[in-house]
Amino acid sequence: MQEISLVSFSGVFALRDGVSEKEFLPRLHAFLQHFIDMGFATSYRVMRREALDGFGKTLPAFTYRGELVYPDLEREHAAYEYVKQHGEQVTSLHVAMNSMVKPDADFFLETRIA
């Protein structure tokens, strides 16, 4: 059985004061879908953090986690290079989404090992 290589780029974040999920999610979906449409990512998901009594005390403060799934590191690296070029479409989508997020967002990259 051939294993599928998966790479996940995730961001943990909170919305700026006064910004609702309802107004934010369409902008986030448009930004994440762009990476699929461009052929970099294969899927995405957006999760809302739920409190778990007695756990998570050492984690940074965040409300949401967005995850873009790539088939391999090469596609993830290509997507990162694409963003660094500051093209008009990706920059516009990023600014529209990012303007609603608190500035303390953080990001991490994971590769599936099992």
What is each of the regions a protein language model found here?
Residues M1-E3, R45-F62, E88-A114:
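Glycine-rich beta-strand-turn "strand-cap" elements at beta-sheet edges
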Residues V19-M47, H86-L93:
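Short amphipathic alpha-helical segments
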